């Protein structure tokens, strides 16, 4: 990571959401490079001066997260908002004690972030899930999330009706907390949730989580990518209603010395979504994929990824992460155990693995079950992922 004396601002990018299951296979899919990733290849986004807090964006973020300090005497629909604030605060506190605190304690004890102090996290198939990205990788400066869900845009809470605001807050709260009961975010549910009027994309859930974790907002930029895989056509999110590839959010806590950044963009990560026809009939990758490939020496995280990287037509995202990342934390829905080992990773098994949910019974990995039976790792002190409903959780920590 290139640091600029204390005049710098860090970046954090987010990617995610589960992909289409039927893209065509691309013959030019790259072969995994099993070469060791040297420490000096670790990179991150460049940093710039810590910007001022954007009071308008910060107030909106506190409003949607139900923060008591967000209440303004001139806020319309005060009764609706106060009721929501009380409800969402109670649910958040329960989520903190049941899920967040056990994960934070486990992460601190495990120490993988100290052994691999990467500054960037790649989170494919993430949707709007900043929550788990932050809990498992709290020290990164840049989180890059990718998903199929639309990025979304904002609205003026003073210019919506009581009915519109009430519906928005109800839909937002449901989209945030129902997935934690399941242990994962459902792709189909997110596709429906993020097409409901004012709740129009992942931007809303990311801002909620950012606020609840004590962050303030410096800027939100709507983004596209140029042919080199760099950000282009950036404009303030307040001037956008639709049509952009994604966004980047600059944020920090009061104690942070620099601004971090979360980047989200919507893209189909199947080979058929990543490759396009270039000159002379050759396949080339799209600009967003070029951007993703720039982050060598990163960490990667996969949770409830619907086993997409078990398939040949998701080889680009699998190989890119294996070539770019010296640490991968995933559950069994990420990469196959044999794929990680073939790519040169040492794999530590965590939790327990005895089954898949019925929907993915054809993705059960017998070799992974045998490896767990041999290793006999301790149970994890939290339940996330598809098997949370069975009181069971597994993770694999792959390092090289």
What role is predicted for each listed range?
Residues 182-250:
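Short helix-loop boundary/capping segments
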Residues 19-21:
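Bacterial signal peptide processing site
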Residues 15-17:
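C-terminal motif of bacterial Sec signal peptides marking the signal peptidase cleavage site
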Residues 30, 37-179, 246-253, 257-400:
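Non-globular targeting/processing and membrane-anchoring segments
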Residues 2-9:
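Sec-dependent signal peptide recognition
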